[in-house]
Amino acid sequence: MARFFALGPLVLVLCLVLFLSPTSTSEQDTDTKVTGSSNSPTIMQSATPTPALPTGSVKGVKANDSGTTEVPCQYRLIVNGYEKNSLLVNINGSKSQNYTIRIKDKKSEKKIPVSIVSDTTTIDILFEWLKPCTNYSVNIDNCNVVGENHFNLNVLKSVNHSAEPKGDEQVCFKDSKWNLTKCVNITTEDSCVQKPIQINLETCNYTMNVHMPPVKPEITFSESIPTKFVWSNKPLSSDNVTSQCKDTFKVKCTDDTEYDLDKDVFLKPSEEYTCTGKYKYYNTSIDSKSKQVNIHCEWINETVFSEVTSNSIVIFWNLSPGDKCKGITWEKFSAICKKSHDQKCRKVNDTTAECVFSELKSYINYTCTLSAEVNKSIGVFPIYTRDFNQRTNSSNPSFEDHDNVKVKETSHNSFNVNCKNLKPDEWNGPKGIYIAKLLSNRPPVTKENPKSCSFTFENLYYHTEYTIEIIAINGNKNESSAKATHSTRYNDKALIGFLVFLILVTSLALLFVLYKLFLLKRKRTAEDEEILLTQPLRRVEPIYAGGLVEAYKNKIADEGRLFMDEFQSIPRIFSNYTIKEAKKSENQYKNRYVDILPYDYNRVTLSTGGEDNYINASFIEGYREPKKYIAAQGPKDETVVDFWRMVWEQKSSIIVMVTRCEEGNKTKCAQYWPSLDREAEIFEEFVVKIRSEEHCPDYVIRHLILNNKREKGSEREVTHIQFISWPDHGVPGDPSLLLKLRRRVNSFKNFFSGPVVVHCSAGVGRTGTYMSIDAMIESLEAEGRVDIYGFVAKLRRQRCLMVQVEAQYILIHTALIEYNQFGETEVSLSEFHSVLNTLRQKNGSDPSLLEKEFQKLPKFKKWRTMNTGSSEDNKKKNRDSAVIPYDFNRVIFRLDIEGNQTSDPEDEEEYSSDEEEESNQYINASFIDGYWCNKSLIAAQGPLQSTAEEFLLMLYQQQTKTLVMLTDCQEDGKDYCFQYWGDEKKTYGDMEIEVKKTETFPTYVRRHLEIQSLKKKEVLKVDQYQFLKWRGRELPENAQELVEMASIIRENGHYDNSKTNRNVPIVVHCNNGSSRTGIFCALWNLLDSAYTEKLVDVLQEVKNLRKLRQGMVETIEQYQFLYTALEGAFPVQNGAVKTPPAKDAAQVINETTALLTEPNSTSGADQKEAEESTAAESNEQGAKESSTAEAPAAEGDGEKATSEGPTNGPTATVEV
């Protein structure tokens, strides 16, 4: 204790001395920069004076060898501002030596060797390699710290950073100063957003303000030219977040071209592109998924030959890229033909050019190429071409040189004539023949030579001057001629020859006089001898098959004047043929009309003999077949026995009846067959039984058994075919109906059949029309040509007034055109599979027969007016501008019609245009003819929201029971149909709709709907069938699923056996009312035909649909689908086609009222009806009272016309 107090004062004195003594500094400043490794800090060493360390911090003071006191090393830590990037360390040492500075954090330690050359040194340490928000401690070996020896760098924000995407879902940000990295997920909410991200460090959170990338871009494009690329998932700003995507997005395609977004891009059509969107982000890019781009234009590439002559061709070329490629415009059109000299093309409009080829040679098949170049301002596109072959018309042969004919005399009255033979190209048409005519004051002499221009004329008149005319006629009847003269020489034996000639002439004259006397006597004794016509027939050339259409066009032009002239030039009655038997008083009651009587020479004579052998019927020749037909009047009650006697005696097995028993409240024919409920009728010795009766829409087939009680054991089968679709006035508007009737009749013929009995009412008009069509088709098949005029004249020589009115004469022409253009396309179910296999077969690159059949179909583009649907007020009501209903069959409904009643078409025609505008409402829907009756289907587009009320009103007024929907409301993002029903009752204007029940099946949904007008109490119940297997496809994958749904609709709606339901239209709708609707309507009618007749005719069905609405069954794939559906509906089992049983039971038909309400096709509203002649039906009493009076004109079939009032026939729709 005493020692401590003794040393205390000494220690205190030493401390005071150290504290008060000034710090020594060196008088010279030296800076030494020491650079370590890349991971070592940069050290700045300075010998500048530094503040003295507090004495209180000194530890371990000791004396050195010299006896002085040695002060231990001390250091102080000074952290400068971070912007200077340095750390100061003050070291006070007692001598120069090497020090080691240790900087440590929790994980690592850095050693920095430092040399001190003075007692006190300040060291700057740059800390780029240090991390922010991290605690560090600084220690120096063998030195004591003054103050704190730890520090941290609280740097909170980054100044510079980089970014690099990591896959599609992450991006990594790296601080360029501190080498800090953080990866974050890319989300939709953060796309293109400026946001801070934090890195959690030891003492604080380090923040980087970054620009987030977008989620992986997706690009879309419009399928059109020009197209536009769109960044479909581009982030959009919301209420809380502002998206700031940079305008650096480009689309790069395989042609190494970059395109901007939302700008017109002209790509080449039908070329495959691979396009990728690229978003520039920092020093890299973010790519979208590659998109395959291939834009197919719906090219319309049509050529129409507007004029073809013997030396020129004018063609209109319509080259339109379609609605999808409206951006393609043409810069110029051009054309070139082989072997031609001059061709010019004139641009008519943006898509059409008129090309004129002139100075051509006659009858040459030219191969030409049309070219169109796209406007270069929109890009480099290929040149579009269209090749065609066309032959120029024929002209007169090049045979007009007067020096061409050479005459060489061989004797005094003989010579040879030669001329230069024409080369093939000099005929200017098909090779023909040479004709030589010798002209003098005597009868001309004519010779033909089909091989060469060489003729020999012998035994000519002596001393006579002849003009020799050589005519070259090519195969198209064009002719040229050349002439020469030559005189025969005098004969030295002229006298002898003259005497001989005089004797011969005298003898011949005497014989001629005797012959004429004999003929005169014979004429007086035989009054029925045929004499020459006092009115010669007109010379009308036969028509070849290839010229039927052109002939029809020529004759129908100018309101059918040529048809009228031809028809009126044929005598109605050939008065040189007697009609004595028909005019006998005892036979007059047997005639239905007093002026339609059979000629005596070819009337059918019954075997009863005497006065009872008369019947109003005539044998008629067919095409090269005598007595092929019997043309008879419709039997009267008084002549039914005679009719059956004629059938029995002539062994006829087929009766064709082309009328109804009553038409227009007039009796046309007695019912001479038994009805099903009576089974048999007895007409004196004849017993007629009915075995079966088949009802079809246009005809009824009855299978009868005919017995003759006088001939035991005799029984014959007679087929009775009654055509019921001939309208009361005019003629059938569709000639294919008569072709179908002909096929039915011929299907029952056999080798042993007698004459076919054909009758209407008078047995002349409709009867003659049917016979003419049948015979002319045989002529067309045998000779490739028809002589309609000659055959009708021939018919009238056999029975008066055959083919009674001009409309029937025209109908014969249109029926032959129909047959020649389309042929026989009807197929029975028993042969369907074998025929279909044949149709599908292909021979190399040639199209199959099925494809050729489809190509025959007319397109009927704009063949009827569409004024209502195309008006400005109604354009907005159409989904598709290419599918607008025709005016003649559009569905008309009226807002002022109260209640659930359908509009009467006859009443509609009486409306004025003002009334129609005010009352009739427009909806895009068309009436479609069904198999059983007209207007039994309605094809409609999917209703828009703005037309939902009109759609429901149409259903309500048409009393529709069944509604077929073939689309979803939306498909592939496109609106196909507004959903006009809902879970709860919906109201649209005055109409309400409610779903009462929903049934879901694998392929369709059935909804039971109730529709009501707020103005009426009646509720309409409708079954809606929505087909589910058509979504996103051009055709259903399984055709049988559609067939099955149609069968279920037929069964549930009782359409198979209910005439009432057949007349109520079924409404079918898809997006535009044609693309899918047309297939369903065609299939519906074909199935009806198959079930009823065991026959189908796909071509005729599609042709009829195309005439009723645009866009129906437009592609070969849709056409083939119908065949595929029928193939599956009627499969082959055990080698035979499995046909469904006929669901239509035979019905008892009262002929006096049957089918009077059925709609009938007419030849058009603008065609006049044939005027009926002022005739009264004769009866027995009237005949007796007026047997000596002049008979009045006959009352015909409602089809007769007087000579003062001829009518025009039907208008043929011809597309070539």
From Swiss-Prot:
GO terms for molecular function: protein tyrosine phosphatase activity. Glycans are attached at residues 64, 92, 98, 135, 160, 179, 185, 205, 240, 283, 301, 349, 365, 375, 393, 478. Pfam families: Y_phosphatase. This is Receptor-type tyrosine-protein phosphatase C. One of its GO terms (cellular component) is plasma membrane. It comes from Cyprinus carpio (Common carp). The chain crosses the membrane at residues 494-514. Protein tyrosine-protein phosphatase required for T-cell activation through the antigen receptor. It catalyses: O-phospho-L-tyrosyl-[protein] + H2O = L-tyrosyl-[protein] + phosphate. Its main location: membrane. The gene is ptprc. It is a single-pass type I membrane protein. Residues 26-67, 899-919, 1154-1216 are annotated as: Disordered. Keywords: Cell membrane, Glycoprotein, Hydrolase, Membrane, Phosphoprotein, Protein phosphatase, Repeat, Signal, Transmembrane, Transmembrane helix. Residues 71-165, 298-395, 401-491 form the Fibronectin type-III domain. The keyword Nucleotidyltransferase does not apply. Substrate binds at residues 728, 760-766, 804. Residues 563-819, 850-1129 form the Tyrosine-protein phosphatase domain. It is found in: Cell membrane.
